[in-house]
Amino acid sequence: MNEDDYKIRRGNAAELFSGIRHIAINILTNEKVFKAGLRRKMRKAAMDRNYLASVLAGSGLS
């Protein structure tokens, strides 16, 4: 993921979005049920709501 490609420039939005993205990457990196790379985990979370719910439940955010 290249942060320079994002077009978020209004106020503190770029900094906030960067922090949210960092938290999401950390959650997916620490998830151990689905053995895959970060990109595959991101794609699976985007397409499978059950997997997304299990990742969020496992991180304590749901």
Curated annotation (Swiss-Prot):
Annotated PANTHER family: H REPEAT-ASSOCIATED PREDICTED TRANSPOSASE, PROTEIN YBFL-RELATED
* Name of the molecule in the record: Putative uncharacterized protein YafF
Which species expresses this protein natively?
Escherichia coli (strain K12)
